[in-house]
Amino acid sequence: MADLAPKYNPNEVEKGRYQEWLDEDLFKPSGDKKAHPYSIVIPPPNVTGKLHLGHAWDTAIQDTLIRFKRMQGYDTLYLPGMDHAGIATQAKVEAKLRTQGKDRHEMGREAFVKQVWDWKDEYASIIKSQWAKMGLSLDYSRERFTLDKGLSKAVRKVFVQLYNEGLIYRGEYIINWDPKLETALSDIEVIHKDDKGAFYHIKYPFADGSGFVEIATTRPETMFGDTAVAVAPGDERYKDIVGKELVLPLVGRHIPIIEDQHVDPEFGTGLVKITPAHDPNDFQVGNRHNLERINVMNDNGTMNEEAGKYAGMDRFEAREALVKDLKEEGFLIKVEPIVHSVGHSERSGVQVEPRLSKQWFVKMKPLAEKVLENQKTDDKVNFVPERFEHTLEQWMSDVHDWVISRQLWWGHRIPAWYNKKTGETYVGLEAPKDSENWEQDPDVLDTWFSSALWPFSTLGWPDENSEDFKRYFPTNTLVTGYDIIFFWVSRMIFQSLHFTGKRPFDDVVLHGLIRDPQGRKMSKSLGNGVDPMDVVDEYGADALRWFLLNGTAPGQDTRYDPKKMGAAWNFINKIWNASRFVIMNLPEDAKPAHMPDTSKFDLADSWIFDRLNHTVSEVTRLFDEYQFGEAGRELYNFIWNDFCDWYIEISKVALNGDDEELKTRKQENLIWILDQILRLLHPIMPFVTEKLWLSMPHDGKSIMVAKYPETHKEFENKEADSQMAFLIEVIKAVRNIRMEVNAPMSSPIDIMIQIDDDNNKAVLDNNAEYVENFLHPKALSVAADIEAPKLAKTAVIPGAQIFVPLTELVNVDEELAKMEKEEKRLEAEVERAEKKLSNQGFVAHAPEAVINKEKEKKADYESQLAGVRERMKELKESK
């Protein structure tokens, strides 16, 4: 048995332990073919930077499940890996290069991509060190990266097959364009937020000089691409002008007035400018009326030659200059300020530009229908909480085609080639044989395209005979945040169903966001982010893991709070001290925990083993149901309250006594319960439980592969549970009375207990030593009828009324003098609060929160005053 430090020090406990686990190969699957497989593939973090608290939350839950199942005898695989994160990583590297005065276009594709690989290697190393500090039991022999050779092969196969099935196509459509990163974005990579803007009301003159129509737009700079003005069919106001031509202000080009169902006659003037190359609705109108598509912007958001003298200006500078010119030329009617929802790039933060572009798309409807159909079967993906299944189905029911090409250099290059002479398109797993005659598409695939294949591509697919694919796919549980259901979860489901015919995972466990103590989302702009490694350095990985799992429910946000981290450390320190006490009280030749003899149990033994049985049953059930917060509460109550506060204290009498046989029994009971507690806690707190378990008599090389606790029928004893609960209530009631009258534990007291029935009397008579050992009474009376003393404190509990005479504890005259002084103080406080609240100036000008606080203070003082007066009445009556 090892000596334990008097205080829990997480840095000492965790130092070197992870490497020992790796050296012992404890993270690899058992290889036991008779065991049920249980697999989790880690949601691959982006190699953009270090992990944040959200990643820590993800992985704490995943590793808890893996360790739990491993101890239950499952053949577990926890597969690590990382995501290349196309846009995000390229943006980071470009920003770094800019600080060095370098530009990727000047460097060239090959040199730039090498820089990104260097970045990836640096941050992958950091991420792996963070995984180690969190104690994640990952099988690194199976580590994957989304640009690995095997995963790249899977990506190409999926692209080619979907293309051959007509589910991938290339076309010119309106897409979301990021002018800063100069790439297309999918709809869910666009974040809408309210911006200040304006409706610019502009005159569009008739070509025949007969007047003008008024057009309102929020994007006047796109007018250079206008090819029509539309009105609603049958709009009586404009029936006479349909077919007439207008002159585009400052441009001079003629455009027709057309009718189209897109126009809402109730909105604005009922006249809409149509810009087919810069608006998705206008694009559809243009298709219906065969209108020209005029693109007026460059890739970087500057105006092109179509904008005339504004060419080369940034789109917003051009807007300002154009509006000024429209005003000077008499075309601007008015500017109406508004606040409207505008799309912004999730990655760069700039306003997205709807823009005509030739891109690759996935036809989503047939794939979405597979998901919706599968969710009606027994083989559906189960969501925890269940409400998120509706979120998935809602999105799949109204899904749009997915733009998958990105104008980047970092990522999976699209496996499409164009013939240099004929323009013919070739899509294949490899380049055409006469590759010198072909040019590969320069674009790469959306990061989420490869991430969508993660659960099966990491296990060997497309080789469906791969041992890992056959054994561990579908995976069992996906743990992730609810904020990426659309980005990732949904896409994994439809790709898996389409290519493997199976769901990718049985269950999806969704957690919320980690917010700061004020409930705000953590962000760089607010400066309220928390580095999980700083938390680990201060409190330890086990404390962080406990915080992340305890007190949270699936699907709910949580708040990071240093006070809660302190409480987590305190709990582990309590476990440490309890373990140290038990180990120090064992004989040198103590044997590992073994099943105790229940026939020799006293009441406290029967009670604690029944409570242990209940805890094992509940924690196992709650882990299986992913209710980790509830499981944490069960563990906390049993360990802190039942075991530490009561059973250890009760056991001290026997451990310090002369009865060697009783002492041995208590030692054996304590080591069994401690062993079971450490096993119960291990999935959540791997480091400290390993240290403590190896410090006590044990069988096996690691608690990680020890058997998870199970219930034992012989430990069930509900009668002992209720009897001990009654005794505890008696002891707590008397302790509370001592506190109320400021009587120290050493002061002698009489305890008089009036009981309601013979059963409770028997409990007290047969177990009086518990009351005596905890309360040290001068005299203990237990009876059905007791005459209440004149001066006494009373407590009522289920089944009994308790009296503690105060004559020997209280000097009545001294106590009365103290109470009178307190009465005057409280009367003054009540009077002060009343004056303040009756002051009209205070009530009229003070914030509502301040007024309510003052009202609360007054009510509190009044309550205290009533208590003091009641106490004074009791004291006077006793004289």
From Swiss-Prot:
GO terms for cellular component: cytosol. GO terms for biological process: valyl-tRNA aminoacylation. CDD domains: Anticodon_Ia_Val (cd07962), ValRS_core (cd00817). The keyword DNA-binding does not apply. Its EC number is 6.1.1.9. Residues 806-879 form a coiled coil. The keyword Ligase applies. It is found in: Cytoplasm. Transmembrane segments: none annotated. Pfam families: Anticodon_1, tRNA-synt_1, Val_tRNA-synt_C. ATP binds at K524. It catalyses: tRNA(Val) + L-valine + ATP = L-valyl-tRNA(Val) + AMP + diphosphate. InterPro entries: aa-tRNA-synth_I_CS (IPR001412), aa-tRNA-synth_Ia (IPR002300), Anticodon_Ia_Val (IPR033705), M/V/L/I-tRNA-synth_anticd-bd (IPR013155), Rossmann-like_a/b/a_fold (IPR014729), tRNA-bd_arm (IPR010978), tRNAsynth_Ia_anticodon-bd (IPR009080), Val-tRNA_synth_C_sf (IPR037118). A motif ('KMSKS' region) lies at residues 521-525. It comes from the Bacteria. Keywords: Aminoacyl-tRNA synthetase, ATP-binding, Coiled coil, Cytoplasm, Ligase, Nucleotide-binding, Protein biosynthesis. A motif ('HIGH' region) lies at residues 45-55. Signal peptide: none annotated. GO terms for molecular function: aminoacyl-tRNA deacylase activity; ATP binding; valine-tRNA ligase activity. Catalyzes the attachment of valine to tRNA(Val). As ValRS can inadvertently accommodate and process structurally similar amino acids such as threonine, to avoid such errors, it has a 'posttransfer' editing activity that hydrolyzes mischarged Thr-tRNA(Val) in a tRNA-dependent manner. Monomer. Belongs to the class-I aminoacyl-tRNA synthetase family. ValS type 1 subfamily. ValRS has two distinct active sites: one for aminoacylation and one for editing. The misactivated threonine is translocated from the active site to the editing site. This is Valine--tRNA ligase. It comes from Lactobacillus johnsonii (strain CNCM I-12250 / La1 / NCC 533). The gene is valS.
